[in-house]
């Protein structure tokens, strides 16, 4: 149930043949074949290109930052202790 049997496929093929005609179907199949051929050529061209990693970028010395030296905690003054 729900599947296409042989008689259904034959009727479907006849309807498609009537709608598009024999010439149009063969033209579409030729275009389909050309598309597959160009796709395969494109895939082969992509595979034949050597893959080179991009050169590593070394940051300039002026952009490298060193952490600031640690500053000692401020010493409490005599006015801070009086309160």
Swiss-Prot record:
Residues spanning the signal sequence: none
Swiss-Prot/TrEMBL keywords: Cell inner membrane, Cell membrane, Membrane, Protein transport, Translocation, Transmembrane, Transmembrane helix, Transport
Record membrane topology: Single-pass membrane protein
Gene: tatA
Glycoprotein found in the keyword field: no
Family: Belongs to the TatA/E family.
Annotated Pro residues bias: 66-75
Oligomer status and interactors: The Tat system comprises two distinct complexes: a TatABC complex, containing multiple copies of TatA, TatB and TatC subunits, and a separate TatA complex, containing only TatA subunits. Substrates initially bind to the TatABC complex, which probably triggers association of the separate TatA complex to form the active translocon.
Function: Part of the twin-arginine translocation (Tat) system that transports large folded proteins containing a characteristic twin-arginine motif in their signal peptide across membranes. TatA could form the protein-conducting channel of the Tat system.
TM regions (residue ranges): 1-21
Coiled-coil annotated residue ranges, if any: none
GO biological process: protein transport by the Tat complex
Organism superkingdom: Bacteria
Protein name per Swiss-Prot or TrEMBL: Sec-independent protein translocase protein TatA
Location(s), subcellular: Cell inner membrane
NCBIfam families in UniProt: PRK00720.1, tatAE
GO CC field: TAT protein transport complex
Keyword field contains Cell membrane: yes
Region feature Disordered, mapped onto this chain: 34-83
Molecular function in Gene Ontology: protein transmembrane transporter activity
């Amino acid at each position: 149930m729900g599947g296409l049997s042989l008689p259904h496929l034959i009727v479907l093929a006849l309807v498609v043949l009537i709608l598009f005609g024999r010439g149009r179907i063969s033209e579409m199949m030729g275009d389909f074949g050309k598309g597959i051929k160009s796709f395969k050529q494109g895939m082969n061209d992509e595979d034949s290109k050597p893959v080179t990693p991009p050169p590593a970028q070394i940051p300039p010395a002026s952009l490298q930052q060193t952490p600031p030296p640690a500053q000692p905690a401020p010493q409490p003054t005599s006015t801070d202790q009086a309160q």
